[in-house]
Amino acid sequence: MGKHIQYQGGNFKNTAPTKYQPTDLKVEEVLINIGPQHPATHGILRLEVILDGEIVVDVVPHLGYLHRCFEKHAATLPYNQTIPFVDRLDYLAAMNSEHAFAMGVEHMLGLTGKLPRRVEYIRVLMAELNRLASHFMAIGTYGIDLGAFTSFLWLMRDREYILRLFEWASGARMLYNYIWIGGLYYDLPVGFEERCLEFITYLKPKLEEINQLLIDNTLFIKRTANVGVLPLATAINHGVSGPILRASGLRLDLRRIDGYSIYPELSFDIPIGEGLMGHVGDCWDRTWVKFQECKESIKITEQCLVRLTSDLKRTADFNPQKMVPKKVRTKAQDCYIRAENPRGELGFFFRASDNGDKPIRCKARSSSFSNLSVISSIAKGQVLADLIAIIGSIDIVLGEIDR
């Protein structure tokens, strides 16, 4: 009747003679494509993955599916008309991107340090609220990647409060055009500070619930601890920044190092990876650092609200557009400005012409682009299922990568 398989003590024994011995079997590597339309890639990203069985041999990211010519737009439009395009870089942190771009142009105009204090505090308040919303999206979708759906729903519920505050202040939920060169589109609506403080008070215990539900969850720890370890030297060599770099053990935060805007006046800590559940720089550390940064953003937000409701409270004669130039005209110069976005260093290099209303060249330095570049280094030797965990922990936005 041909070959039979007999079960003997846990081993299957082939009673018929075999033509090939196990040592003669050939193993071939398999190439698969993940994306560009795949929820686990967090955007329009294609990963060319070479596998030996289920072990990742190499990963090659392919970009360009979301390229929208930002730098060409920036070189052909007046400075103030470029801000709506800046919103579309990291569309999950548009306030932070606007802040960085506005600071760059203000530096060229000689306005650094001359803006009204209320304007500066409102800018930082909005930037930190947007950092919270961005980290909520990052941690929530990461939970989905690993099979934890409830945490995503809870974080999206809390993120919705922030989007409603932004909509109240700017009229938009995601792409704001609120931070203008030299000022703001509009002062905060009456009652905004009080409602924002109510939200922060509500949020504190909710974060502890997320910590118990996801961050300290045994299954989550098993899926992320000791997975995708990013050594500090590798992170520095690839230009990694933000929470991904800090998770590898380097306490580097541009808000503290550069001290831009009013951050030197604020008190906050800079969490770094400590390897509490595994190895420093693993997937769990990257998620834990982002979670701790949410707590620090709450501290900064509270300090801003205290100032905005006391010595910097609204007055009838306050005009947030007082320093906004009607037409931006710069001197011939080169300028590079950077800011600490939720995903790391966002920088803008300007080459300006004399008395020009637009730059000769505007180069955007994307944090997500540099952070994604380490995927090949840290994914090799991991199983395919862990590759998904690694991508989610890096937290990329393709709008910022492709530009």
From Swiss-Prot:
Protein's UniProt keywords contain Membrane: yes
Highest taxon listed in the record's lineage: Bacteria
Principal location: membrane
Transmembrane segments: none
UniProt-listed SUPFAM superfamilies: HydB/Nqo4-like (SSF56762)
InterPro entries from the UniProt entry: NADH_Q_OxRdtase_suD, NDH1_su_D/H, NiFe-Hase_large
Membrane topology reported for the UniProt record: Peripheral membrane protein
Keyword terms, alphabetized: Cell membrane, Membrane, NAD, Quinone, Translocase, Transport
Repeat found in the keyword field: no
Enzyme class: translocase
Any Pfam family the entry gives: Complex1_49kDa
Any Gene Ontology CC annotation: plasma membrane
Documented EC number(s): 7.1.1.-
Reactions catalysed, as given in the entry: a quinone + NADH + 5 H(+)(in) = a quinol + NAD(+) + 4 H(+)(out)
GO molecular function, one term: quinone binding
Cellular localization per UniProt: Cell membrane
UniProt subunit comment: NDH-1 is composed of 14 different subunits. Subunits NuoB, C, D, E, F, and G constitute the peripheral sector of the complex.
HAMAP family hit by this protein: NDH1_NuoD
Family: Belongs to the complex I 49 kDa subunit family.
Reported function: NDH-1 shuttles electrons from NADH, via FMN and iron-sulfur (Fe-S) centers, to quinones in the respiratory chain. The immediate electron acceptor for the enzyme in this species is believed to be a menaquinone. Couples the redox reaction to proton translocation (for every two electrons transferred, four hydrogen ions are translocated across the cytoplasmic membrane), and thus conserves the redox energy in a proton gradient.
PANTHER family on file: NADH DEHYDROGENASE [UBIQUINONE] IRON-SULFUR PROTEIN 2, MITOCHONDRIAL, NADH-UBIQUINONE OXIDOREDUCTASE 49 KDA SUBUNIT
UniProt-recorded name of the protein: NADH-quinone oxidoreductase subunit D
Protein source organism: Amoebophilus asiaticus (strain 5a2)
Name of the gene: nuoD
